[in-house]
């Protein structure tokens, strides 16, 4: 039996039409929550995930501490650009998102599901549909 198998992954995503920082803001928020969870709750197996991403416990500990003190929005403020980049979100402007999806495709991913976060998710859905999908389908 010969079957095609899709290799899929769910990726943190957020987009803005023109402002890269605003487009990365939602991804920064969910990355903060995920990273805090890795530090606080998933010892052991999380170390492997962090190693693969090139993240150090000391690097993300401030994210977890901020989550404990002030919740997800406080944690978001501790997610630096360097940390966010290591998390490999599909985030930023439409052009940034196209480039990020191409990276996933080049790595062998054949099915990408987006976990949208941030402001105005309906607008984000529209932007992905109109300004990203036409360039990455195929």
Cite the ranges covered by each PLM segment.
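Active-site-adjacent structural elements that line small-molecule/cofactor binding pockets in enzymes
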Residues: 1-138
């Amino acid at each position: 039996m010969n079957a095609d198998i899709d290799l899929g992954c769910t990726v943190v995503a957020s987009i803005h039409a023109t402002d890269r920082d605003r487009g990365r803001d939602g991804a920064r928020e969910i990355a903060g929550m995920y990273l805090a969870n890795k530090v606080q709750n998933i010892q052991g197996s999380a170390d492997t995930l962090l190693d693969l991403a090139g993240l150090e416990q000391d690097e993300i500990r401030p994210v977890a501490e901020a989550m404990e003190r002030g919740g997800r929005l406080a944690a978001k403020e501790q997610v630096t650009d360097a940390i966010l980049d290591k998390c490999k979100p599909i985030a930023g402007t439409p052009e940034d998102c196209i480039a990020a999806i191409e990276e996933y495709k080049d790595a062998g991913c054949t099915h990408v599901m987006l976990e949208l976060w941030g402001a105005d998710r309906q607008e984000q859905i529209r932007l992905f549909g109109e300004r990203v999908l036409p360039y990455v389908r195929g």
